[in-house]
Amino acid sequence: LPAFATEINWADLEAQSAETVAKGEFITVDEISIKMWMPTVLAAVELTDEDKEGGYIGYYMTEDESAAIAVVYADVDGMSLEDYKAALADNGATEVEDVTVNGLPAVTYVLEESDTACIAFTTEAGYVLEVAGSPKSDEGFAAILSFVMASIQGE
């Protein structure tokens, strides 16, 4: 994701990469009126009550379980994106960058120890929406993950 531009618009990607886009479909995250593109190679995994209590609102994994994308909606007590960014750095996140995705301000970052790339948005309700994917070191999966992140938009 370090190759991510600071301003990303799905319409630009869609025009350049119709073949890739055709290999997935938009899913809606009901809790927060957000939709995002998810490749068909990643299937939704049923969440347990424990997952839901942990803030997970979606989990998508390849059939061989070698790659996954998690969608988390967590209460951060109204923390601003700037405050969240500072907390990320304090907790070992690297490559923390400000981005704008389809008009929404966000932060991208990397968790090296778990080979995970993440994007986070704060919401008016005082929550943070995070989309995280692993393994980011897999070039093919990293490309798919960047598409997923670039597709996040309001409904």
Question: Which positions does each model-derived feature cover?
Answer:
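N-terminal targeting sequences that direct proteins away from the cytosol to non-cytosolic compartments
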Residues: 1-56, 114, 125, 132-155
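Short acidic-hydrophobic surface loop/beta-edge motif
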Residues: 22-31, 58-62, 97-101, 109-111, ...
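Generic structural motif
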Residues: 29, 44, 69-71, 93-96, ...
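Short amphipathic beta-strand/extended segments with alternating polar/hydrophobic composition
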Residues: 37-38, 70-73, 119-122, 131
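A short acidic-to-branched-hydrophobic micro-motif
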Residues: 58-83, 128-132
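A short, polar/proline- and glycine-enriched secondary-structure boundary/capping micro-motif
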Residues: 81-82, 119, 139-144
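Acidic Ser/Thr/Pro-rich low-complexity disordered segments
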Residues: 82-86, 152
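Signature of long, low-cysteine stretches enriched in small and polar/charged residues
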Residues: 85-128
